[in-house]
Curated annotation (Swiss-Prot):
One of its GO terms (molecular function) is translation release factor activity, codon specific. This is Peptide chain release factor 3. SUPFAM superfamilies: EF-G C-terminal domain-like (SSF54980), P-loop containing nucleoside triphosphate hydrolases (SSF52540), Translation proteins (SSF50447). It comes from Nostoc punctiforme (strain ATCC 29133 / PCC 73102). It comes from the Bacteria. The lineage of its organism: Bacteria, Bacillati, Cyanobacteriota, Cyanophyceae, Nostocales.
Length: 542
């Protein structure tokens, strides 16, 4: 590798940060995302993208159904600069029915921001997503939101995180008051109080007054009771709380905690500044040839998301690529690990929700969009130089099943195309009956809303109305060893055998009891709630 390229890669990695936000629905994720973009200069007013009509819709919620319902149902990538750093914000679905899409997004993230509602504390979806971060070893930064509303005591919230998640906590800032009495936050590192003025509905950057802790004006600006409460809290934190240890943070054992209000912009910029200082830079990725450092001179990356029809005018399909190593350049030739072919990466795009612009280069930590004419699948690796392949992204056990019918034979081509493209992008898992006479696809989902999205998009994007027939199953298990292992068992009862999109056998059960009964009768049968990962395997066409 040339010294010039080595220096270029080191500098690029140094200036990049990459993170996803995880939260329970209604914790304020979309609002926090908007405010981070506001401070990053990517938008001038929260809810309106720079150079776009003032539609006042959330920047990250671009899909028609999202804007109709006011919920986030698909992950997007939002890229912006702040203090010379290139930040890739991997926005995840806020609705719990789309946790699988969130998991795929976390595969591309170096850090996670755990957003918590101060009134509610830890909630079920947050706990689930924390476990995913823990499995992947992703550092977690906590932002406790909605301090401008009545909520639980800050010390109680820290204790809940420590007791339930097993994480040490370090409060980087500390709230002064809560609800109507919320006055700002205290920066423990700089020993400064940030007193905030409310901006117009939080749509503009908040102006704050910074006062040193020993400044005599503090008692004038704060109610006496709040001032003494702050002093007592700080003494307690210093006396019993741990010191900040960035090694523990990067190992996922300690979480820096920030308090604020995304709606009114309190504490958002302070969080962003410290996040850039503390967060992991793009690091090594495990591959078929071992760990590969981001400064490895050859280019490599993997597909973590596919999205069809981001631009309905052009009926396009985009593959989201996380750059892992080396330098990406427009029109470069790369090896496609799964299909074993050389392909040209033309028309690369920088992504900003639905907005896109052409780019010429990208570096480790960046996410780029590539037009996807049926070449890419989720989990695919592309590379130059020595052959390598990154770990695939597994599918998880769905809990709801339904047969999808097309009542209009004249729309069969559009129906098949729509189902195939939605399957490829992971909108829902698709399975098929082993009975060749039954051609209707079986949708397998984590939540009911996934079914609604599939039907909505088939009609909105492909012009196909469909009929959904719910099936009486709630448990799916993949058979380890495939069809051969299943044939050795012989005839089995109280289960239905189907095949997934890769042609692998899956057993569907009405309940967990039926599943356990089968395992009791056939202990030699090995079942898995997670689909085996074979990134080189091709989907079957039905």
């Amino acid at each position: 590798m040339s010294t010039e390229l080595q220096s270029e890669l080191i500098q690029a990695v140094e200036l990049r940060r990459n993170f996803a936000i995880i939260s329970h629905p209604d914790a304020g994720k979309t609002t926090l995302t908007e405010k981070l973009l506001l401070y990053g200069g990517a938008i001038h007013e929260a809810g309106a993208v720079k150079a776009r009509r003032a539609q006042r819709k959330a920047t990250s919620d671009w899909m028609a159904m999202e804007q109709q319902r006011g919920i986030s149902i698909t992950s997007t990538v939002l890229q912006f600069e702040y203090q010379k750093c290139q930040i890739n914000l991997l926005d995840t679905p806020g609705h719990q029915d789309f946790s699988e899409d969130t998991y795929r997004t976390l595969a591309a993230a170096d850090n996670a921001v755990m957003l918590i509602d101060a009134a509610k504390g830890l909630e079920p979806q947050t706990r689930k997503l924390f476990e995913v971060c823990k499995l992947r070893g992703i550092p977690i930064f906590t932002f406790i939101n909605k301090l401008d509303r009545p909520g639980r005591e800050p010390l109680e919230l820290l204790d809940e995180i420590e007791q339930e998640l097993g994480l040490q906590t370090y409060a980087v800032n500390w709230p002064i008051g809560m609800g109507d009495r919320f006055k700002g936050v205290f920066d423990r590192h700089k020993q400064q109080i940030h007193l905030f003025e409310r901006s117009a509905h939080g749509s503009r950057e908040a102006r704050d007054t910074i006062v040193e802790l020993g400044d005599p004006r503090i008692e004038e600006k704060l109610e006496q009771s709040l001032y003494y409460q702050l002093k007592n809290d700080l003494e307690l934190l210093e006396g019993v709380g741990p010191e900040l240890d960035l090694q523990l943070v990067h190992e996922g054992k300690m979480t820096p905690v920030f308090f604020g209000s995304a709606m009114t912009n309190f504490g958002v910029e302070l969080f962003l500044k410290y996040f850039l200082e503390y967060a992991l830079k793009p690091g090594s990725h495990y591959s078929s040839v071992g760990e590969v450092a981001p400064t490895y001179p050859e280019f490599s990356g993997f597909v973590f998301k596919l999205q069809a029809n981001m631009d309905p005018k052009h009926r396009d399909r985009v593959a989201f690529i996380r750059v892992c190593t080396g330098k990406f350049e427009k029109d470069m030739m790369v090896n496609h690990a799964r299909i074993g072919k050389l392909i040209r990466l033309s028309r690369p795009q920088k992504l900003f929700a639905q907005e896109r612009e052409s780019i010429d280069v990208a570096y480790p930590g960046d996410v780029i969009g590539l037009n996807n004419p049926g070449v890419f699948a989720i989990g695919d690796t592309i590379y130059t130089g020595q052959k390598l392949e990154y770990e695939g992204i597994p599918y998880f056990s769905p809990e709801l099943f339904a047969s999808l019918r097309n009542p209009n034979p004249s729309k069969s081509k559009q129906f098949q195309k729509g189902v195939a493209e939605l399957r490829e992008e992971g909108a829902v898992q698709i399975m098929y009956s082993t009975d060749e006479a039954k051609r209707d696809p079986i949708l397998a989902a984590v939540g009911q809303l996934q079914f609604e999205v599939v039907q909505f998009r088939l009609q909105n994007e492909y012009g196909v109305e469909t009929i959904l027939d719910l099936l009486p199953y709630s448990v799916a298990r993949w058979v380890e060893g495939g069809w051969e292992a299943l044939e050795k068992v012989g005839r089995i009862f109280n289960t239905t055998t189907v095949k997934d999109s890769m042609g692998r056998p899956v057993l569907l059960f009405r309940n967990e009891w039926n599943c356990q009964q089968l395992l009791g009768d056939h202990p030699e049968l090995k079942l898995s709630a997670i689909a085996p990962v074979f990134s080189s395997q091709q989907p079957v066409e039905e």
